[in-house]
Structure formats: C-alpha cells, structure tokens
Amino acid sequence: MIYGLNNFAKSLEDMDFFHIFAAVKKIFTINQIKNCMKTKLIHYLATAAMMLLATIIGTGCASYSDNPANASNKLTDAEKAELLERAYVYALPLMLMDATYLHMTNVVEPVGQQQAPPNRLIHARVLANANTKEVVTPNVDTNYTQVMMDLSGDALVLRLPHTDRFCLAQILDAWSNCIAAPVTTDIEGDYGYYCFTGPNFKGEVPANMTHIASPTDHVWMLLRTVCKGKDDLPNVHAIQDEMRTYMLNDYLTTGAEYTGKGTHNPDYDFKAPVDYIMTMPMDKFFARANELMLTNPPAKEDAKWLADLKRINVGPGLKFDASIFGSEAEQLWTNLVTNIIAITTPRSQQFVKPNGSWQFYGEPIAEFGTEYYYRALIAVAALAANPVSVAVYPRANVDSEGKHLNGNHRYCLHIDADNWPDTNPFGFWSVTLYGEDNFLYDNEQNRYNITDRDNWKRNDDGSLDIYVSHEADTEHPDNWLPAPADDFHLIFRIYNPVARIAHNEWTMPIITRLD
C-alpha cells in the first residue's frame, strides 16, 4: 500500500491544486475515512496527507503558483531568454488573432466594412482603392465577407448561396491555422448550410449541414467573392445579401437570423492589431495569452513545446510574472518584440519559394503544424494567409537583373503563351502594384492591377506583355500598369492555382527593364 501511495503522490506533481483534491476524494471514500480509526488506514492517510502537503509546498503546484519564480529558479539567464523567445513566438499568432477579434467586434451594431458584433456578417460593398488604408497590400480582386465567431455559448450556422463564380470561405482557428475552405460553386441546390462548433460542443449537428469542428472557441471567416469591376458590384451584392448566420438553437427553434448586439470598449479602438500587440508589456501579453489558451486550447502536438514553456509559467491558465527575468526583463522584451521579423525569418527560410524575380511563402503556410517560427512570421507579415492550394501570392521587388523596381524606368512583364498562370475551374489571377508603403498607387486611371478579367491585348503568338512605368504608355494603353516615380513592388495573385503553380513548378514571368 505504501508503494501505491508513493506512486499516487508522485502523480500529483503533474496535477493542479483542485485536481489533487479530486484525486484524494476519489481514492479515499467517506466510509474508509469513518473506518480509519479501526484500521491501519489512518497511517496510510497520514502518509498520503504528508506527501500531498509536501507536493503542494515543494512543487508550489508550479502551474498555478502564487510565486512563478519557483518554476524557473533552476534556469540560467540564457535558458530564460531562450524560453522567453520561444514563448513569444508560440503565442504571437494567438495574440494577433485575438487583437483582430477584439477590434473587429468592438461595436454595438455593424459599422462600415470592417466591424460587427461577434457572429454577425460584415460585407465589403466596394473594391479597394488608393484610399484604402485599413490593411496593407489590399486585394482589388474580391469583395470580402467576414464573421468573427464566438462558439463558447452555442454553435453557429452559416448559410451560403450557390454561385457560378469564385466565392471561397477561408476558416481560421484562433491560432491562425486554416481549418476549412468551403467553396460555393460546390453547393448543390440554392444554399449550403455549415455548422461551426467549438471544442466543448455537446449537441448534435443537423444532418443537412456540413459540420466544421473548430478546436478553438474563436473562429475567423474571410469569404472572398471575385468581382469583375465596378459594373459587377451589384452582382456581388446580390450574392452577399443571400448569406446568413444563425445560432444553432435559434435555427432549430424559431429559424431567426442572428442579430445580437455587441459592446464597445474604448481600449480596443486601436487601428492596427499588430501595433496594439507590439506595444503591449510582457506581463500583460502573457497574462492574456495564458487566459486565451483556456478557451482556445493548444493542439495536442504542442505538448512537448508547452512542457518547456511551463518552466516560465506560459501555458493554459498559468500565472506569468516578468519578475523571474530580473532587471533585464524590459530589455529582453524590447529586443524580442523589435527584432521578431529578424528572429523568425532565418527559421522560416526553407519555406520561402524563390522563382526568378519573384518569391512567395510556401507550404505549410496556414497549416503550420509545429512550425511555430514560420507561423509567427506569417502572423506578423501576412495574417490570414491562405494555404497554397487556395492561393499563392508571389511578390517581386526587383527586375530580371536584380535591380529594384522603380517607376522612373519602363518594364515589361512577359507571360509566354505556353506558360500561362493556369488555375482550376473558377480560379483567377491578377498583377497588382504597390508603393513602398504597401498601399495602392493613386493614379488618374484608377488602375491598380492587370487581371485575367481585363480587356488587354495579346501578342500574335498568344503571349502577353504587361507594361509598367510612371509615364503613360500610349503605345500599349490596355496593357499598361501605372507606377509611382519611386520604388514599387508587384504581387501576382493566383487563386485556385493548378498544382504545378501551387508547388512552384513553373517559371514565373520575367520582368525586363526596357531602358
């Protein structure tokens, strides 16, 4: 029996305070306690009690300690710094997704094209233009529809109409992983119904619905509907107007669309989630991250990584205290936050796909698994990126000779007839120009990109030349993309690409300087 108690006490080391007492109650019943005076059980109870007390005091229940320093008092300064970096890299996507959620839902009723209460639809009714400054490198090809879901109370039902054009719903969990990507062209009948459930959902999903089980309570849906230009907007609006959200219980009882009101907190009136997170103190950052992990639990494959982070009290429900890093805490934090791109880029380089003047982020983008440094880099540089099976976004900063693109020169982007940016059905492509500030270039033509939907002219051999310059190209007006008289870059978006493009098995168009 003593051997069993030793094992029992040892098992307590991996349990929190409340689970310890639950375990004791499970082992020793009330009747056993009543009979303890008549048997030697009292000796065993005393032994177990002492072991229990020693465990609580000795380990400090490290995961719920009032003094987190106990969890790290055996670490060297170098080990603490390494664990802090790993903790920041691990939690950063979760925190950026949370900041985006807090900002986008920080309204009582839907406002504009970017904000609505949780579980309500947000429609972008116009295409991006040179005045669009909410996000960098704005997309000029599609109109967005978004929902910030909170699945903690009930499942959410999303209704989408069948379409005959590209209309894809990217579904992100709270860690920025894409967990599903339903397309409306696949819908049979007039509508498709999708039931989103959180990790603690206990009900039943109706048989006529596609079940999307989220590992986290917070979910971000970004739905893109391709638009052929200003004259096509009424058609896009008609598609958006057929979309609905319902809470599952309401759908099953009254059938009422969800119209719940939200709340407003002035603390969340920041414009850029990344700036909000990057200026957050260490204690506040990890306190919030630890809290979020309770309702947005880490993946099972993260267990080994989290076991290490637990040594500085980073993990679900843990109590973080920056004082364990001593007088160097502030400097450590400043260096980490300031240099996060420089820290994550070398550890992600193997995933960057170079191709002539171009390069793009490849697999496992949006399906990161345990590639935490890559996940953090994308969260900062391209939050809500798609998997390569959905879209790729090659970027070019230089011409074929490796010189920076600048509007004071003339360029030709040449696409061979037998090297077309092929897509699967309903896919599309575009070449969009951005200034050094990552925004669209304001020009008299209001032309921000060249797309497969435009009326450009091919060469006699079937190839296509796109001309880029600051000065107007009167010789090729339909194929001309205006540029600033300064540095710029190009992004070649390809949605629903064929496999050879998604896997970088084709030759990207050459960008030749003409002067």
Q: Could you say what each language-model-derived stretch is?
A:
Residues Y3, H19, Q32, H43-Y44:
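Low-complexity, intrinsically disordered or signal/transmembrane-proximal segments
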Residues N7, I20-A23, T29:
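Short, positively charged and aromatic/hydrophobic N-terminal segments
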Residues D14, C36, A49-M50:
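Residue-level detector of intrinsically disordered terminal segments
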Residues K38-A48:
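Bacterial N-terminal signal peptides that target proteins for export
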Residues I57-G60:
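C-terminal motif of bacterial Sec signal peptides marking the signal peptidase cleavage site
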Residues A62-D515:
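A compositional/structural signature for long, glycine/proline-rich flexible linkers
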